[in-house]
């Protein structure tokens, strides 16, 4: 009898060991994904959180109208698991969107349009040159924010000395860690792809004007920078857009948006249907 009990205990211990090993293997080797695609914005776009002057109309996301001193933001409603505390793994992601900046005058345009990654409880920050995302030109690790800015107005306190419009990568500060001069094509649709490679920590930004009529101008731009996301942003984040105007202004519109991320070593998946 004792021998049978011993055998049963041994069996259950072996079974428990195999079960725990299987669960651990599944957790380590599975991938958590988040995906969504918005090809046309609806008036009651339920998977967006609007802040400030942001709203949807006529199939577009409007962040600002061409009026002075406005801030408009829109966030994806579901938080994104951008890195995993248990495994230390960081997500690969790619997001693509089309946007238009349309100003009454091509010479007097302001201020900024940006895609950003921020804490889940993010709120609109200082407007004007601060994107509605930051409050200071100084590095502030408590900001926990990464932004890709499309800057149409020169701010001497932090912008590149060449005074050109530019694409910038911002890490916890409005002062970009890297920039690329950019020729705004007023009223033209721009296609943007932003990709993050978790193996190299390289964030890559590409902007193209597919329908440009300005043949003499550069119509494609690429910018890269090493951004250690795990050291900058929280484990769970929100992603979204922000745009601002000041004394000068422009309408800032997003016409489509898609996002896909993959985080290894977790065990859940979130998929959002096309909207």
UniProtKB/Swiss-Prot annotation:
Keywords per UniProt: Calcium, Lectin, Manganese, Mannose-binding, Metal-binding, Signal
Binding site for D-glucose: 111, 129, 246-247
Signal peptide feature range: 1-30
Gene3D superfamilies: 2.60.120.200
Entries under PROSITE patterns matching the protein: LECTIN_LEGUME_ALPHA, LECTIN_LEGUME_BETA
GO biological process: carbohydrate mediated signaling
UniProt cross-references to Pfam families, sorted A to Z: Lectin_legB
SUPFAM superfamilies named among the record's database cross-references: Concanavalin A-like lectins/glucanases
Keyword Signal: yes
Post-translational modification: The mature form consists of two chains, alpha and beta, produced by cleavage of the immature protein. These remain cleaved, yet fold together to form one subunit.
Annotated Mn(2+) binding sites: 149, 151, 159, 166
Positions contributing to Ca(2+) binding: 151, 153, 155, 159
Site positions (Cleavage): 210-211, 217-218
Keyword Oxidoreductase: no
GO molecular function: calcium ion binding; carbohydrate binding; D-mannose binding; manganese ion binding
Propeptide residues according to the Swiss-Prot or TrEMBL record: 211-217, 270-275
Note: Binds two manganese (or other transition metal) ions and two calcium ions per heterotetramer. The metal ions are essential for the saccharide-binding activity.
Family named by the database record: Belongs to the leguminous lectin family.
Function description: D-mannose specific lectin.
Subunit organization: Heterotetramer of two alpha and two beta chains.
Protein name as catalogued: Lectin
Organism whose genome encodes this protein: Lens culinaris (Lentil)
